[in-house]
């Protein structure tokens, strides 16, 4: 039986690795990201922005045209910046929440009707960020903590429908999300911030 999986942040480091591994194992993977590659065997690129419900609705329509059931939704979409919690612009603060927290919320809400008994939702968070945040990574830690609590609460609700929700606490992985170019000094201790750098929207 053909099994279909939706992966967000599918063209980032961890997302891309997951997509390739799933495709190799015979899953048909809907690879969702803002910028996508060419379709290859078992991988169907879906261009969409997790912060834009209209974009996700179009993605849903594309997926729904090929199948009415998803075996799993796997979340890798996310952004990361280094910044001071007292200096980060409001727009930067809000954007990280829109991608890291609301992104998962929007995807799950829109694609929920394609899940059924035995389906799964897998959230990817940082192993250390929610538990032991470091200086200038506080906002990232806050969003990942929120995603943790969202996932655990969602698990209790969806288990009533036979849908499993899991959280993967990934350790440190060298990917584009962790490569940021400092652009200005922050605070008086000589630390650096990457607020003005272009963040990746793919976790990994």
Describe each region flagged by the PLM.
Residues 11:
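Conserved glycine-rich cofactor-binding loop
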Residues 41-54:
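Rossmann-fold cofactor-recognition segment
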Residues 84-85, 92-94:
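Substrate-binding pocket helix/loop in short-chain dehydrogenase/reductase
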Residues 122-146, 152, 156-159, 172, ...:
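Catalytic loop of short-chain dehydrogenase/reductase
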Residues 160-204:
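SDR active-site lid
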């Amino acid at each position: 039986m053909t099994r279909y999986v939706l992966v967000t942040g599918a063209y980032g480091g961890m997302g891309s690795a997951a997509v390739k591994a799933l495709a190799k194992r015979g899953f048909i993977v809907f690879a969702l990201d803002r910028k996508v590659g060419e379709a290859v065997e078992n991988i169907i690129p879906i261009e969409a922005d997790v912060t834009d419900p209209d974009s996700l609705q179009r993605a849903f329509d594309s997926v729904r045209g090929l199948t009415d059931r998803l075996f799993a939704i796997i979340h890798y979409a996310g952004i990361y910046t280094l910044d001071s919690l007292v200096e980060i612009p409001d727009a930067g603060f809000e954007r990280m929440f829109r991608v890291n927290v609301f992104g998962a919320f929007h995807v799950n809400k829109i694609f929920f009707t394609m899940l059924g008994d035995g389906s799964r939702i897998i959230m990817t968070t940082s192993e250390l960020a929610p538990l032991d945040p470091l200086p200038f990574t506080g906002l990232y830690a806050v969003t990942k903590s929120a995603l943790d609590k969202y996932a655990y609460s969602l698990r209790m609700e969806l288990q009533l429908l036979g849908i499993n929700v899991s959280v993967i606490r990934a350790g440190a992985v060298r990917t584009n999300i962790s490569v940021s170019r400092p652009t200005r000094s922050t605070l008086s201790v000589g630390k650096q911030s990457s607020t003005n750098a272009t963040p990746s929207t793919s976790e990994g």
